[in-house]
UniProtKB/Swiss-Prot annotation:
The active site is at R173, K199, H267, R270, H293, Y302 (o-(3'-phospho-dna)-tyrosine intermediate). GO terms for biological process: cell division; chromosome segregation; DNA transposition. Keywords: Cell cycle, Cell division, Chromosome partition, Cytoplasm, DNA integration, DNA recombination, DNA-binding. InterPro entries: CB (IPR044068), DNA_brk_join_enz (IPR011010), Integrase-like_cat_sf (IPR013762), Integrase_catalytic (IPR002104), Integrase_recombinase_N (IPR010998), Integrase_SAM-like_N (IPR004107), Tyrosine_recombinase_XerC/XerD (IPR023009), Tyrosine_recombinase_XerCD (IPR050090). This is Tyrosine recombinase XerC. Residues 16-107 form the Core-binding (CB) domain. The keyword Acetylation does not apply. The keyword 4Fe-4S does not apply. Forms a cyclic heterotetrameric complex composed of two molecules of XerC and two molecules of XerD.
Amino acid sequence: MAKRAEPLPDPACAASDIGQQIVRWLTHLRAERRLSPKTLEAYARDVRQCLMFLGQHWSEQVTLEGFVALEPADIRSFMAARRADDIGGRSLMRSLAGLRSFARFLEREGLGKVGALGAIRAPKVGKSVPKPIHMSAAKRFADASERAGEDREPWIWARDAAVMALLYGSGLRISEALGLKRRDVPPPGAGDVLVVTGKGNKTRMVPVLQNVLALIHEYVAMCPHSLPPEGPIFVGARGGPLRARIIQLVMARMRGALGLPDSATPHALRHSFATHLLSRGGDLRAIQELLGHASLSTTQIYTGIDSERLLDVYRTAHPRA
């Protein structure tokens, strides 16, 4: 299927020469940098919003030449306008990152250097502390019997329990768990490591507890749909790929029954995995590897070690071990 073309900026505020370079830049990010579709969409939106602001600010179309000649005051005015629209610090940081990425692309292509962006400091952003779910409650999310009163087929209970067990038991992102193929999960007695594809299509080895594997195999045995080796292991009621929204809704219903706050989400199970490992003596760098964080600073909000060390830390520290 052909890839969707990125929308050009509004021609009322931006000339065709800069619009064409934006399309080339986004194509480069997709093909060479392998950024996620959501990141590409956000970057494209941020740059378009900047061009719309500049077009109104200058009362003329923004050309490539005009963009290269930006003054620091122009960027500060754009950021101030975004703040006035109640845009938060993290979104402003992303906007600035997108503009800088586009500027670097123009410079590499020999189209000029946007010096104004180098004079702008990134907005300060307070670090948000993840809210882990209590250990006993986190385990209950992976217990299919907690949903015994629901009018659902037992295989769906088993499926949801297996997914949530992976989020808490192996610290996977919801996209990583739902992206697993049947062949990615070892059959009974054939190992306890998953090869997970994370952000940027990077793969990592992730240990998986035997009781989590047992839940996955129980679901597979109960599933009425065909699960070919190259297809997704987790499927929806009609046999298609399972959507993250389904698991989010399941957790929303369960957290109400368990008396948990709205912060008890699929991603909170991943946070809980890291927090509970760390509280039991897990090594910070080992947890970084398990989570697939590119930078230790990301892990330090709560979380090159060899695979045997990862397995040892995991088996020793995880509360489900």
